[in-house]
């Protein structure tokens, strides 16, 4: 018997590469509401939060929910690209052949936005993830890139998502003009204790589990150690299953949870 079968699971719901089980707690729903609002109003949006709170999951879920006949999503992660790669990737996102010159890519991107917005009535949704890595140069460029002076209406949605230090970057006086254009600003705090319990329960249920896996003291220990961070909850729960299987347990107790937490914190 493997550890998945031992705990009545069809698969391990706490692994990153397992089947997606989206748990929509109150904060997740609030983020979705605000992103949908931004999609209607257009302009700049800001989504921040500590690592592991589910920003990227929320963004991908939002993007997947959009009608492709009305919206075109271009996703970029600043953690893995250079400045030039960023603009080339954005041009390619609009199905355009990128240039080796930034000024040419500016023109290509602006013309693509105009074609989509004016001719096809399609709103571009540009998601810039890991934006806490953004340079002052790119921020200044964004202000110019999406400043269509022909009329006062925004023609695209630009979402900057990243860790809390992104707010510190944007608070610099040099970025005041860009900050004034932000129409949606939300900071994710993480799961409450109640939401954390529901999160674990729905993860297990989504994996076909019909039996009790975690004892209440174990859940309490996991939630206290994770501080409401879904990524850490997943990490601790996964370790609990492995340790529990190795020890021949039927349910995960507090001692097993503490061992899993300590192993991960030391590792």
Report each predicted region and the residues it spans:
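C-terminal alpha-helical "lid" subdomain
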Residues: 2-4, 60, 177, 194-201, ...
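Conserved Walker B catalytic segment
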Residues: 44, 114, 120-160, 173
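Short regulatory helix/loop adjacent to the ATP-binding pocket of P-loop NTPases
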Residues: 63-66, 166-181
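Conserved NTP-binding/hydrolysis module of P-loop NTPases
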Residues: 9-14, 71-73, 81-100
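Walker A/P-loop nucleotide-binding motif
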Residues: 40-61
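Conserved alpha-helical scaffold flanking the Walker A/P-loop in AAA+ ATPase domains
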Residues: 34-37, 103-119
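A short, basic N-terminal segment
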Residues: 1-42, 258, 262, 267
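Conserved AAA+ ATPase "SRH/arginine-finger" region at the nucleotide-binding site
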Residues: 76-79, 170, 183-196
């Amino acid at each position: 018997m493997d550890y998945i079968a031992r705990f009545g699971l069809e698969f391990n719901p706490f692994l990153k590469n397992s089947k997606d089980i989206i748990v929509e707690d109150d904060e997740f729903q609030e983020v979705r509401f605000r992103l949908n609002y931004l999609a209607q109003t257009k302009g700049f949006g800001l989504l921040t939060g500590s690592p592991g709170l589910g920003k990227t999951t929320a963004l991908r879920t939002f993007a997947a929910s959009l009608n492709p006949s009305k919206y075109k999503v271009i996703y970029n992660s600043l953690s893995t690209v250079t400045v030039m790669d960023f603009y080339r990737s954005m041009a390619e996102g609009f199905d355009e052949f990128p240039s080796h010159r930034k000024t040419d890519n500016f023109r290509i991107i602006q013309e693509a936005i105009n074609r989509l917005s004016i001719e096809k009535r399609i709103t571009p949704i540009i998601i810039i993830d890991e934006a806490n890595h953004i340079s002052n140069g790119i921020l200044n460029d964004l202000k110019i890139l999406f400043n269509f002076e022909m009329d006062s209406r925004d023609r695209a949605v630009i979402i900057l998502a990243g860790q809390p230090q992104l707010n510190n970057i944007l608070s610099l006086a040099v970025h005041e003009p860009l900050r004034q254009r932000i129409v949606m600003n939300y900071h994710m705090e993480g799961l409450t204790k109640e939401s954390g319990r529901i999160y674990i329960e729905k993860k297990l249920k989504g994996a076909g589990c019909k039996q009790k896996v975690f004892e209440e003291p174990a859940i309490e220990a996991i939630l206290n150690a994770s501080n409401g961070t879904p990524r850490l909850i997943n990490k601790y729960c996964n370790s609990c299953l492995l340790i529990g299987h190795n020890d021949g347990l039927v349910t995960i107790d507090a001692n097993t949870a503490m061992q899993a937490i300590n192993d991960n914190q030391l590792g």
